[in-house]
Structures are given as C-alpha cells and as structure tokens.
Regions:
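Sec-dependent N-terminal signal peptides of Gram-positive bacterial secreted proteins and lipoproteins
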Residues: 1-25
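N-terminal small/polar-rich segments of proteins
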Residues: 24-122, 148-191
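Low-complexity, intrinsically disordered/propeptide-like segments
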Residues: 9, 15, 19, 112, ...
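Intrinsic low-complexity, intrinsically disordered segments enriched in polar/basic residues
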Residues: 2-3, 28, 128, 132, ...
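Local beta-strand/beta-hairpin segments that build beta-sheet-rich folds
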Residues: 16, 33, 76, 128-153
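Short, intrinsically disordered, low-complexity terminal segments
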Residues: 7, 22, 35, 141-143
Length: 191
C-alpha cells in the first residue's frame, strides 16, 4: 500500500511540476485593436442685427424748402445682419419704419418720405431694390430678406443712394429729425 501511495504522489508531483515549468514564447508581432471616439459639438450660431444706418441729409434754407420740392441724398452707413444659425433655419426679414420728422418745437416736416435704395454689398440675402417709407408709419416696411440661404454669412447692405423727399412748404428753421426703427424677424414670410 505504501508503494502505491508513493507512486501516486510521485506521478502527481511530476504532472504538477511539469505544468509549472511549461511556458509559452511571446509572439514576435502581436496584434491588438481597440477603438476610441473623437467628438465635438457645434452649437448653432445666432441671427443678429449687427449694425444699422443713420441717415444725414445735410442742410437747407427756409427759402429752399419754401420754393421747391426737395430730394436730398443721405450719407448712410452700412447695415449688417449676421446669420450663423446654419442651413436648416427658416430665414429672416429686415424691415424698418420711420417716425414723423420734427424739430425741437414738435413742428413736423410734412409728407416726408424715405426712399431706400438698397444694394447688397456682401452675403446671400435678397434685397428690395427701392422701398419708399412714409414718415409717421406704424407698420415696418420690408427692405431685405433671406429664405433658403446658407445660414453661414454676414449680410451687408449699402444704402448710399437713399433719399429723403418732401414737397415745398412753409417751415420753421431748426434741426429736424425722426427715429428709424429697424426690425429683424427670425422667420421668412413672403409678402
């Protein structure tokens, strides 16, 4: 019995010892592959009315106004709309209205009209070539719009041929001015 137990232990020892001695050689060119992610988030930009034009129509005398109808060319600046919302937006519209043109004593320039001659200096918007806006209007008048644009542009409008017209009239001297209200609407609605 002693012999069989010893031989079993010897066989087990050789078998177990054999497993501990075995090792495997490393491969010369191992291949391993894992994936990771590269990502970024692009936020939509904004639709913004960046700059609007002031209009200066110079000086006249009371005699000039009393004797003849007037057409005065202004010295405006650039008007600018930036649209960086991307191509899937509904478009936009730029309109304006003009208050009564009055002096410091609240005397109104009668029948004044702002004749906006708009050209696109840069961008992809559509402009209304000539628009007449009566002083004292309450509803804005469309001057430029964008529908189906890229949504990736700054749009500049040149208003250098804009005029102010009014008929001859009896008038007081003084500085006359009105408020031009620009309205940028975040939607396009054909008129």
């Amino acid at each position: 019995m002693k012999k069989s137990i010893l031989s079993t232990i010897a066989v087990l020892g050789v078998t177990l010892g054999d497993g501990a001695i075995n090792s495997y050689a490393a491969e010369a060119n191992p291949t391993a592959e894992l994936t990771s992610e590269a990502s970024l988030t692009i936020q939509p930009g904004i639709l913004n009315l960046d700059a609007v034009s002031n209009f200066n129509f110079g000086e006249l005398t009371i005699q000039d106004v009393a004797e003849s109808d007037q057409t005065l060319t202004g010295t405006p600046e650039i008007t600018k709309v930036s649209d960086y919302r991307g191509p899937n937006e509904s478009g936009w519209m730029l309109s304006l209205k003009l208050s009564d043109i009055k002096n410091g004593n609240n005397v109104k320039l009668q029948s004044a009209k702002l004749n906006l001659a708009t050209t696109r200096a840069k961008g992809d918007a559509t402009v209304t070539a000539t628009t007449t806006i009566d002083a004292g209007t309450t509803e804005p008048t469309l001057v430029a719009s964008a529908n189906g644009t890229t949504g990736l542009a700054a749009n500049e409008f040149d208003l250098s041929n804009t005029t102010l017209t009014f008929p001859k009239q009896n008038i007081n001297s003084g500085r006359y001015s009105g408020t031009v209200t620009w309205v940028l609407t975040n939607a396009y609605t054909p008129e």
